[in-house]
């Protein structure tokens, strides 16, 4: 059983929940968060226990790990919303993550769910994890995108256009002139579709993401992660997918 960590262990008995404050502000402020030697993920204790048992400090270390390892823009993340235990963190929905961290929220949610399902093995192959996350995540959330921090707090999904893989697939289905027989509807009303030309789809997505090494195996792995978020639903047929309850824009009467 982990030692319990009270709110006063790291924080003063004053209200600090400023909506504009990022968690990195507190990492750099010893009044709130005493300095500690940063460890690599595999050397850190929090990586060896289930996220539900993380203390608040472990949650902070996890956030720092995500920003360092996957080049997330820390200015997007509101520390106020992550001053919680691991159990509370695991109880957050994807929508709550996006409310707390803007476009980075979906990225953080995906990483957490991967750690919960894979355990310590998640940290054994960081390059493979990065490749999968790159296929899945919103690239506008990366530091290298040059996006301004205030833009990270805009939660409008319409501005993302086709930066997500599932949106790219949706838009391709809705654009016969660009589709070229790569995808086809099996049941338009139910949102069920089939990948007809798998490698052509992977090549087209790779060109958009400037990734010459994209394969359908990698692309399909990224698509399967959408099962966890309700964007796609599993269909027990090869190369067949279905839009889920959290997908939008594919219905004919809601375009």
From Swiss-Prot:
Keywords, sorted A to Z: Activator, DNA-binding, Nucleus, Transcription, Transcription regulation
Principal cellular location given in the protein's record: nucleus
Residues within the DNA-binding region(s): 163-244
Single Gene Ontology BP annotation: regulation of transcription by RNA polymerase II
Cellular component terms per the entry's GO annotation: nucleus
A Gene Ontology molecular function term of the record: DNA-binding transcription factor activity, RNA polymerase II-specific
InterPro entries: Ets_dom (IPR000418), ETS_fam (IPR046328), Pointed_dom (IPR003118), SAM/pointed_sf (IPR013761), WH-like_DNA-bd_sf (IPR036388), WH_DNA-bd_sf (IPR036390)
Residue ranges crossing the lipid bilayer per the database entry: none
Domain PNT: 33-119
Signal peptide segment: none
Pfam families reported for this sequence: Ets, SAM_PNT
Domain notes for this protein: The PNT domain acts as a transcriptional activator.
PANTHER family assigned: ETS, ETS-RELATED TRANSCRIPTION FACTOR ELF-5
Main function: Transcriptionally activator that may play a role in regulating the later stages of keratinocytes terminal differentiation. Binds to DNA sequences containing the consensus nucleotide core sequence GGA[AT].
UniProt similarity note: Belongs to the ETS family.
Name used for this protein in its record: ETS-related transcription factor Elf-5
Lineage per the UniProt record: Eukaryota, Metazoa, Chordata, Craniata, Vertebrata
Underlying gene: ELF5
């Amino acid at each position: 059983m982990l030692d319990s960590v009270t709110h006063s262990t790291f924080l003063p008995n004053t209200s600090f929940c400023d909506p504009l404050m990022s968690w990195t502000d507190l990492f750099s402020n010893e009044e709130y968060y005493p300095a500690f030697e940063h460890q690599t993920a595999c050397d850190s204790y929090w990586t060896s226990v289930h996220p539900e048992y993380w203390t608040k400090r472990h949650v902070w270390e996890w956030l720092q790990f995500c920003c360092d390892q996957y080049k997330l823009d820390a200015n997007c993340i509101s520390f106020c919303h992550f001053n919680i235990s691991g159990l509370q963190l695991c109880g957050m929905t994807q929508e709550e993550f996006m409310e707390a961290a803007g476009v980075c929220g979906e990225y953080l949610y995906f990483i957490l769910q991967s750690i919960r399902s894979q355990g310590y093995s998640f940290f054994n192959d960081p390059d493979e994890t990065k490749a999968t996350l790159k296929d899945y995540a919103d690239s506008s959330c990366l530091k290298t995108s040059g996006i301004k921090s205030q833009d990270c707090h805009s939660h409008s999904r319409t501005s993302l256009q086709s930066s997500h893989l599932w949106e790219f697939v949706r838009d391709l289905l809705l654009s016969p002139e660009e589709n070229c027989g790569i995808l086809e509807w099996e049941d338009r009303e139910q949102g069920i579709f089939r990948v007809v030309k798998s490698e052509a789809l992977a090549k087209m997505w790779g060109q958009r993401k400037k990734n010459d090494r994209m394969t359908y195996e990698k692309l399909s792995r990224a698509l399967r992660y959408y099962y966890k978020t309700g964007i796609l639903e599993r269909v027990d047929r090869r190369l067949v997918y279905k839009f889920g309850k959290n997908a939008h824009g594919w219905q004919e009467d809601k375009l």
